Design a protein with these regions (language model features):
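Extended, charged catalytic domains and RNA/DNA-binding interfaces, predominantly
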Residues: 109, 156-161, 165
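Histidine/acidic residue-rich metal-binding segments in metalloenzymes
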Residues: 146, 154
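Enzymes and membrane/adaptor proteins characterized by extended Gly/Ser/Thr/Asp/Glu-rich
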Residues: 9-10, 15-144, 166
């Protein structure tokens, strides 16, 4: 279906997921996984790009830490420290280095949009989505801002668009 939409509906982008997405609750149908291995994903992205006469946005949600669609268990080299770990070390050069590793991997695969960094503040210690998954650099806005800036700069070097979230 996505191929038809790219060709016939002139959509301008896709987002890649490593998990099956429920498409029909009633029938319990799921999409097939679209991230299996580095070679498979690179080939898939090339095929998708050939379908459109326009430059497509090929997006992923690759923050690092627990939020990784490109895990080392599938052969990818993008796995990095979590935002929380980076914020605790409070070394923006390290954050840049870790984000650069992600950006290099995305660039190599042909991905040009990353739904990251997460710029939420770690103020709710009970949050199962942000705090418990270590997705925030800190509970202090200044720390979050300077690490987010380093993260974004690393992606800019590879012309990977970033989407700061969930504020």
């Amino acid at each position: 279906p996505i191929c038809d939409d790219i060709i016939n509906e002139n959509i301008s982008g896709v987002i890649l997921f490593s998990k099956n997405v429920l498409t029909s609750v009633m029938e319990k149908k799921y999409t097939p996984k679209n991230i299996i291995s580095p070679n498979q994903l690179k080939k898939l992205i090339k095929q998708i790009k050939k379908l459109s006469p326009n430059k497509l946005f090929i997006a992923i949600d690759e923050e690092g830490g627990q939020i990784s669609r490109l895990p080392s268990s599938l052969g990818f080299n993008a796995t990095t420290l979590s935002h929380k770990q980076l914020g605790e070390k409070n070394d923006t050069k390290l954050t840049y280095k870790e984000a650069k590793k992600i950006a290099e991997t995305l660039n190599d695969l042909g991905i040009n949009v990353n739904f990251a960094p997460c710029i939420d503040l770690a103020i709710n210690k009970e949050s199962p989505i942000i705090y418990k998954k270590e997705r925030s650099f800190s509970d202090k806005p200044q720390i979050v801002a300077k690490h987010a800036q380093a993260y974004i700069q690393a992606h800019n070097k590879y012309k990977i668009l970033t989407v700061a979230k969930h504020f």
